[in-house]
Amino acid sequence: MEAKMNKIDTNVVELEIKVDAKDFNEALKKSYNKNSKKFNIPGFRKGKVPMNMVKKFYGVEVLFDDAINACIDKTYGVALEENNVRPVDYPQIEVVEVGEGKDLVYKAKVTTYPEVTLGDYKGLEVEEVSYEVKEEDIEKQLADMQARNARVETKEEGTVENGNIAVIDFKGFIDDVAFEGGEGKDYPLEIGSGSFIDNFEEQLVGLKVGESKDVNVTFPEAYGKEDLNGKPAKFEVTVKEIKVKELPALDDEFAKEVSEFDTLEELKADLKEKAVKANELRAKREMEEKVINAVVDNAKVEIPEAMINREVENMVRDLEMRLGQQGLSLEQYYEFTGSTEDKMKSYMKENAERKVKTDLVMSAVTEAEAIEATEEELKAKAEEVAKMYSNGAETEKMVDLLLNAQRAALELDVKREKTLKMLFESLK
């Protein structure tokens, strides 16, 4: 086998590969053996037709396709390796010369991984990010805990007020015609929650139990249903019951009921400690994003369209999987959002291109710094992942499984973490 490489465009090369006539003839014999049962010639049992008779009656060309494919399978990978070519997609194959007793010559047009030209990535200046935990943040968390533990009681007298729960029957109309999904019975609506469209909830304030009212609203332009988007609607609403939330007192008894702490002060201290840690993690992630963005923006790389398209397909599959976990399909998603597959892919393309560039640039930094993952680091990462999904004896089994089946992914994670650490340590 011989292979010559020509660069024909940015990130595109053409390999001209020659397979020796002897090897091609061997491939023809294997093609004959593989397909022998398909040939029917009078005077011969099925599967017993000699090769020379097959060539006479059908022509030797009938054996070419399988023989050519076998030769390509055997030689294409070798040609890539010999010429240090990293493909990002399947090649475009063109057979140049083929014939019995002749060399097989074919061309493979290959889109390759792009070369990354790194800019400055060490000694960068990035504005530090930090978040303060304020007293009102803790008070809000306590208020949320109060609301979750509130007792709901029937309001015997009075009218609907903000913060009340109105139990309602409703039926919606557009142009005096009832629409699908616009009707509800005994629906508990918390006034002021913003869970209904427009100013629906505000219009119920002041109503008594048993009273009815026509509530006029307008659906948002991007509501998600073509027949409702931007349309004015009327809802016939009847208040059947009014409920109020009785919030528990914020005291030591409350702390004992909702946590493992004996006093309210201990509970508040715990909430603050957790908030500080959450803010530190948030700040760290934002700093990481800033550093990565700076490194990526300083680099230059021409990304092949094939890589972007592949990432878009990955994003679509990821969305489909997440929707499936919620019992939804892509088709339902398109209907709810008023989108289409083409629109969604077009929307995803910019993010896909950025992700591909980020991965390429960060890998180039890792390579430039000769950063490697040691066996100890791989095992530590495997243990970290395993502990998220198992415990005890099962953890050790999962560690072994990860080290064998997901070694490349673990290595990528470790290298990325070490690369980020190096970038942070070099910040001015």
Curated annotation (Swiss-Prot):
Residues 163-248 form the PPIase FKBP-type domain. GO terms for biological process: 'de novo' cotranslational protein folding; cell division; chaperone-mediated protein folding; protein transport; protein unfolding. PANTHER family: TRIGGER FACTOR CHAPERONE AND PEPTIDYL-PROLYL CIS/TRANS ISOMERASE (PTHR30560), TRIGGER FACTOR-LIKE PROTEIN TIG, CHLOROPLASTIC (PTHR30560:SF3). It comes from Clostridium perfringens (strain 13 / Type A). InterPro entries: PPIase_dom_sf, PPIase_FKBP_dom, Trig_fac, Trigger_fac_C, Trigger_fac_C_sf, Trigger_fac_ribosome-bd_bac, Trigger_fac_ribosome-bd_sf, Trigger_fact/SurA_dom_sf. It catalyses: [protein]-peptidylproline (omega=180) = [protein]-peptidylproline (omega=0). Keywords: Cell cycle, Cell division, Chaperone, Cytoplasm, Isomerase, Rotamase. GO terms for cellular component: cytoplasm. NCBIfam families: tig. Its EC number is 5.2.1.8. It is found in: Cytoplasm. Consists of 3 domains; the N-terminus binds the ribosome, the middle domain has PPIase activity, while the C-terminus has intrinsic chaperone activity on its own. Involved in protein export. Acts as a chaperone by maintaining the newly synthesized protein in an open conformation. Functions as a peptidyl-prolyl cis-trans isomerase. Belongs to the FKBP-type PPIase family. Tig subfamily. Gene3D superfamilies: 3.10.50.40, Trigger factor ribosome-binding domain, Trigger factor, C-terminal domain. This is Trigger factor. Its main location: cytoplasm. It comes from the Bacteria. It is an enzyme of class 5 (isomerase). HAMAP family: Trigger_factor_Tig (MF_00303). One of its GO terms (molecular function) is protein folding chaperone.
